[in-house]
């Protein structure tokens, strides 16, 4: 961001804040694993991090704001894409909901043998995905 501001580039970034690494958590669960240390609230911690992405972006020279709803996100995005400079729009999101498998098949290794039913099911899904990949 700082470089884009320094170089007088124009871009709009939308940061979806799910308080952790939601996409990795969904991938981990989707491959039969149990959620582990991907979402801040579920990880080992003494103090939960409260990252202020708006302040962080602004500290690097970007115009930054937080959208409180999808309608506000749409309005802020429409404004941002029509002006020069770096804009950052942050919106809080739920880390769980997503398109199936993130909208595409990821070839992520799944154990062939496991005592967990979720892993056995994920392995079968991996085999099916591999067949589709190879045609």
Regions found by a protein language model. Name each.
Residues 1-135:
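Thiamine diphosphate
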């Amino acid at each position: 961001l700082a470089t884009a501001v320094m170089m007088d580039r124009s871009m709009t970034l939308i940061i979806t804040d799910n308080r952790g690494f939601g996409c990795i958590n969904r991938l981990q669960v989707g491959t039969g694993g149990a959620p582990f240390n991907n979402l801040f609230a579920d990880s080992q911690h003494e103090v939960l991090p409260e990252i202020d992405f708006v302040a962080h972006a602004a500290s690097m020279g970007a115009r930054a704001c937080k959208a409180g709803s999808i309608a506000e996100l749409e309005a802020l995005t429409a404004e941002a894409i029509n002006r020069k400079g770096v804009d950052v729009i942050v919106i809080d999101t739920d880390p769980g909901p997503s398109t199936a498998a993130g909208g595409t098949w990821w070839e992520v290794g799944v154990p062939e043998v496991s005592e967990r039913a979720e892993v056995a099911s994920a392995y079968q899904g991996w085999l099916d995905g591999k067949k589709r990949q190879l045609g």
